[in-house]
Structures are given as C-alpha cells and as structure tokens.
A protein has these predicted regions:
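Substrate/ligand-engaging "lid" and interaction regions
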Residues: 1-479
Length: 479
C-alpha cells in the first residue's frame, strides 16, 4: 500500500484564490468537495490555503499527505445506493498561524486571493476585546480575519479591486451579519480608521450562508476496507451523505464569480436566506422531533426503520407533506423536492441514526421546530394538525419514563426543571393534570399553550389512547 502524497498521486497546481479557516471534516467534505467539482466541471481553476483557526488542530496530518485526501459519499441518490470515493486535490497547503504568523499574513499580499470561507464552530464568530492588532495572531477568528483584511488594505493601498468575498459556514442564522458586526467591533477597538472601514464596506462582501450535509467524519469501522480498495494509506478520509445544499445570501455578480451552478451543484444564490432556513428547520428538523418518540414508543430504534415501517412511515409522510409543508411560503414543487430528499436522507442505508439521540431536549426542540407550524396550520386551516399534536403527546409520554413492551428502558434527558415538572405531573396519574401542567409551563413555551383552542383536549385524548391502546394503534387512528 502506497503513502498518499503528490509523488504517488496526481495533484494539479492551481492559483491560490481561497483562504479557508478550518481544516475539519465538514469543510473538507462539503466546501472543498464543491470546489473540486467546480474545478473539474466549471473551469474554476482555484486552490485553497487552509488556515488552522486554533493552536492545535489537524494540519500536520493534512500536510503529511500533501493535503490530498478522499471523500467517501454514501447514501441513496434517486433511490439508487451510492458508495463512492473521490480524491480531493484542491488544498495547496495548510498553515498554523500560531507558528507561521508571517506566512499567514503574506496570504493578504497575494493579488489573486478572492474568497474567504470559514467554519470555526458556532462559538467561533465572537468578539474578544482582549485581542490586539499586534497579536501574532489575534486569538479569535474574526480578529485574525480583521488582521488579514487590514494588511491587504495597506499592501494594495486601498485598491477597490482587491477586496475579498467572505462566506462563513458556521451554524448560526445570518452568520454573515454576525461576522460583519464583529469585524466592525475590531475596526473600532483597534482604531483602524474610516478609510479602512469604507474599503471593507465597499470592496469586500460578507454574506450569510446556510449549509446542509450530514458528515459522519472519519470512517473508523470501514477504514481498513477503504484503504485496501484505494491502495493508499489515507488517514484523512472523510465520509459524508450524498445530499448537499449551500444557500448563499448574495447578489448575482457574486454568483458569477463562484459558478457552482455550472458544475451542477446544489448551491443557491438568493436574496434572502430566511425562507431556506425555515424550510430546513420545518421539514428536516421538525419531522425528526416528532417521529423519534412515536418510533421509540412503537419499538423502533433507528430513523431508517421508522421511515420503512408500514404505520410509522405513513405518520412521517403525513406530518411532512400534509401538515408542515402547508405552513411554508416557498413554491410547492420546491418544497416537495426538498421533502423527498429529506426522506431519502432519513432512509440512508449507511447511517444508523438512533432515535434516542434525537430525543435529547425534546421540549425546546418542539418549541422551535414544530410549534410554529402547529400554530400556522391552525390559523390557515381552522383545525389542529393531528400528526403534530400526536407528536407532542408522544414526547409527553416518553418523559414518563419506564420501560417499553420489549423491556427496553425509556430514559428522557432534558433540563432539570423540565424533568422535575414531568415527574411531578405523571405522579398524579391524571392525564388531564399532565396535559394542563405541560401546556401551561411558560418557562418551556414562552406562553400558555392551554389557550390554543382545542389543544389541551386533543393532547389528553392522545395521551389516554397511548396508555390504553399503545402507540401504533393511536397512530393508525389518525392515518
């Protein structure tokens, strides 16, 4: 078996046009895979310089392989099983700014640099007032980026054609707005002056993005077989699902510079990210939250098995297509395609997604992912959505604890205040009291849900049915 490097494998040399903060699994399986496809199919002709955002990371392993690695895509594509391996060659080099500060700052001096892409976790986009301009480097990611931008501004004497296009991928709603605000805070803190501020405002663009791809990461259990198949000793293989979506809130002139559409990729440039954020939360996360307790209390442990179950599968379909989809404001055909993609992802034969892992903090999840849909549905249709109501009753039942019919334990996990409340309510043995107490817990919902017409009665009816007939019979009654 060969080592993987540019001596043993082909690596194309391309102009360095992208600075990427982050060397983790997600960026390598998502952004770098996208850039690889743009190079191959849309003549993008760009390479990436990776910057490790924190002092300790994985760039030594990456550099040991000359930044070559494979992406293993697994899942269903239009019903067909796919399990592919692709060598990604887009990263030219990887730097640690803590030990290579000069080389890091020199990136700003390269005239062809055009893009900055980051994923430094949700905590990464934060202002740290202890950062100084002369730090080598500033400790926060926005601090490092401001150092780089200011050096570029000075190097090219405020040349308006040398601005950078910045795409943060951190999982924060309107991440671009947050990053921009933080850079303004550093401009203020470090007294970088109005001229630089004007250059940043006019020559650079920081755009909000929404990313979506499940990336399990390094394939520990399959790695021996993968290496055998590749005949390379690749220690940076990254596994991901086939589905990918990148929504970028930016004008068409930015899209023209980043021609992902020409490579047939699911990268959308849109005037507003908000409806896509809402679509993901509603049609991907929303069904997850209600299918999990329904599945588990029906004796099903894995999301894929829930989708394939003759009763629970129909329940999931009803919640998605007949209830939640009716509450969104995007074109119907687009929503249906997205929902079918979601079901294909839930059905992934390679990922054993345990429903219990989704059950963590179910009440706050229902509040953000399903409650808005329940209210909108009631408003638009004049009646309650049966599946979403049953989902709430299933969560309440799950929090009773105990054991399933097959002897498996039911172990809820949530904020202590919620756990204590449910324990106390179920101790009464009275489903009317349980319902009223849960719906009236304003510390969970921010309001009293007993005031929603018909909700308390419908939840109690479901709780009684689950106790008397079991979960599957209760689900059958609404299909």
């Amino acid at each position: 078996m060969k080592a993987l490097n540019k001596e043993t494998a082909k690596k194309t040399v391309r102009p360095e046009r992208i600075i990427q903060f982050g060397e983790g699994n997600f960026l390598r399986a998502f952004v770098d895979w996208i850039i690889y496809n743009m190079n191959e199919k849309a003549d993008f002709n760009s390479s990436v310089v990776v910057v490790q955002p924190i002092e300790k990371g994985m760039i030594d392993m990456l550099n040991a392989q000359d930044c070559l690695y494979h992406v293993n895509l697994q899942g269903l594509d239009k019903g067909e099983t796919v399990n592919s391996l692709t060598m990604i060659d887009v990263i030219s080099r990887a730097l640690n700014p803590y030990s290579q500060f000069e080389e890091f700052m020199k990136l700003a001096e390269q005239p062809e640099m055009r893009f900055v892409i980051s994923n430094t976790t949700e905590a990464g986009i934060a202002f740290d007032s202890s950062c100084k301009l002369e730090d080598a480097p500033a400790s926060s990611y926005p601090g490092k980026l401001t150092q780089l931008l200011y050096h570029r501004y000075k190097t090219f004497q405020g040349d308006m054609s040398k601005g950078l296009i910045i795409f943060p991928c951190e999982l924060i709603f309107l991440n671009g707005h947050k990053l921009k605000e933080t850079i303004y805070q550093y401009i203020e803190l470090w007294n970088l002056g109005d001229d630089f501020k004007q250059w940043f405002e006019k020559a650079c663009g920081v755009y909000a993005t929404l990313v979506d791809r499940i990336v399990p990461g390094f394939p520990r259990k399959d790695i021996a077989a993968i290496k055998e198949k590749l005949q390379y000793d690749d220690n940076m293989v990254v596994q991901a699902e086939i589905f990918h979506l990148w929504v970028i809130e930016a004008p068409q002139e930015v899209a023209a510079e980043f021609p992902a559409d020409k490579a047939g990729l699911n990268v959308l440039f849109v005037p507003s990210e908000a409806p896509y954020h809402e679509r993901k939360v509603t049609l991907l996360n929303g069904p997850h939250t209600v299918l999990s307790p329904v599945a588990y209390l029906s004796g099903i442990n894995i999301v894929r098995d829930a989708c394939r179950h003759p009763v629970v599968g129909k329940f999931i379909h009803k919640v998605m297509f007949e209830e939640l989809m009716e509450t969104l404001n995007l074109p119907k055909a687009e929503l249906e395609k997205f929902a079918h993609d979601v079901l294909e992802r839930f059905n992934n034969p390679f990922v054993d997604h345990q429903v219990t892992s989704i059950m963590l903090n179910s009440f706050p999840k229902y509040q953000t992912r399903d409650l808005p849909g329940l209210k909108t549905y009631l408003e638009r249709k004049g009646k309650l959505p049966e599946g979403l109501v049953l989902g709430l009753a299933a969560i309440i039942t799950y929090y009773k604890g105990g054991v399933r019919a097959d002897g498996a334990e039911i172990v809820p996990n949530d904020a202590q205040e919620i756990m204590d409340l449910l324990k106390q309510l179920w101790a009464t043995g009275d489903t009317a009291k349980v319902t009223e107490g849960v719906l009236g817990a304003t510390f969970i919902w921010g309001e009293d849900l007993n005031l929603i017409p018909g909700l308390a009665e419908a939840v109690k009816k479901n709780l009684d049915s689950i106790q008397e007939k079991g979960m599957l019979e209760t689900v059958k009654a609404i299909l």
